[in-house]
Every structure is written in structure tokens, then in C-alpha cells.
Amino acid sequence: MNKIANTEVEINIFNLLKKLWKKKFLITFVAIAFATAGLFYSLFIVTPQYTSSTRIYVINPNTPNNSITAQDLQAGSFLANDYKEIITSTDVLEKVISSEKLNYPSSQLLQKITVSILKDTRVISISVEDANPKMSQKLANSVREAAVSKIKAVTQVEDITTLEKGNLPKAPSSPNIKKNVLIGFIVGAGLSTIVLVIMGILDDRVNTEEDIEKVLGLTSLGIVSDLNKL
């Protein structure tokens, strides 16, 4: 009994795959349509964003004569996380808003800022994203200056070095056009395949001799050809 059931499942899956293969051009068309929609969205709907990055290096305040040991480096890495919180603090953000005369709240400015700590270092990278490349550079440098001032005030650290000033981005960092087109293609192909599979599963029409035998329990004696095709 189980063998018969397994055979039926295999036959159903095989028939389903045959139906999908017959619809391969439809699946491809839908996938290309979704990919085109992703391209259109990336080029004409979403606003391109530009990212400018600046980096600072912070010395551990407890390090005598600026001599660096492995223990100091580890301690500095932990302190870098504290500095990360200081950089994104409300005081720093409000200072940037005031100096740059921005007309949006600190919460919106915070969404533009990404602070990252390079692994096993005390190098902190500050990136700012904006629709205007010059503004992203200006904000990155402004955030760095305000953050350095705040870090010195809070931690009593005086030795903070600017490794890199904010760069002027030449090309947008987002949207990722290739990624959006690929996602659109995959989603289109996936959705069309799922719809066709569901339609195939729900299709209870009698199409083959095997379907007649299964539904009616009768043995087929022959096939009557379509006279219109003769």
C-alpha cells in the first residue's frame, strides 16, 4: 500500500515538473518583469545616497608615555565601544545640528551615521550617508569634530588623532542596482513558480488515461482521437 502511495506521489511530482517546464517561458517572463521593476525602482524611484567616511585613533588615557602593550590594545578596544556611544550621543548630534544649521531632529541625523570599530584596533570609523555628496562629507567631518571634543571632555583623553578626513564620494553607495535587479529576478521566478505549483496541485481535471483509471476505477480500452485534428 505504501509503495503504491509513494508511486503516486512520484508520478504527481513528475507531472508537476512537466507542467512547470512547459511554463518555463512564463516563469522567465515574470522573473524578467520583476527584475525590470527592480531596475526601474533603483534608477527612478529611490533617491541615491552618498557615504563619506572619516577615521580617528584614540590612545588609552592610562597608557604612560604613549607606550602601547597588548594589554593596552585590548583595553583600548573596550574603550572604543564607549567612544562609539559618545559619538552617537544626543549632545554630539545636537552640536552638529546647530553648527550645520540642519532643519531635522537628532533622531534623523542618527539614522545617517554609522560608527564602526576596526577589529583589534582603536581605530574608529565614522560614516555619514546623505543624498548630497558634499553634505555627507561635511557632516562626517562635523560629527568627527564634535565627537572628538566630547570624548576629550568625558574621558580626559587628549591624544586623539584624525587618521582620515571625510572624503568626497564620487559615486552613490546606495541603492545597489545589481542587487535589486537580482532580488527582483529571484522573487519573480519564485512567486510565479509557487503560483503554478499551487494551481497544479489544485487542478483536479482529468487529463490522462491514468487520471481516468484513478478517478473512475476503470481500465482504458483505447483512445478516441480528436477528429478536428485529423
Curated annotation (Swiss-Prot):
Annotated membrane topology: Multi-pass membrane protein
Gene Ontology process terms (BP): capsule polysaccharide biosynthetic process
Bilayer-crossing regions: 25-45, 181-201
Pathway assigned in UniProt: Capsule biogenesis; capsule polysaccharide biosynthesis
Cellular-component GO terms for this entry: plasma membrane
Subcellular location: Cell membrane
Domain of life according to the entry: Bacteria
Gene Ontology molecular function: any one: protein tyrosine kinase activity
Main localization, broad class: membrane
UniProt keyword terms in alphabetical order: Capsule biogenesis/degradation, Cell membrane, Exopolysaccharide synthesis, Membrane, Transmembrane, Transmembrane helix
Biological function: Required for CpsD phosphorylation. Involved in the regulation of capsular polysaccharide biosynthesis. May be part of a complex that directs the coordinated polymerization and export to the cell surface of the capsular polysaccharide.
PANTHER family per record: FERRIC ENTEROBACTIN TRANSPORT PROTEIN FEPE, TYROSINE-PROTEIN KINASE
Record-stated family: Belongs to the CpsC/CapA family.
Name used for this protein in its record: Capsular polysaccharide biosynthesis protein CpsC
Species of origin: Streptococcus agalactiae serotype III (strain NEM316)
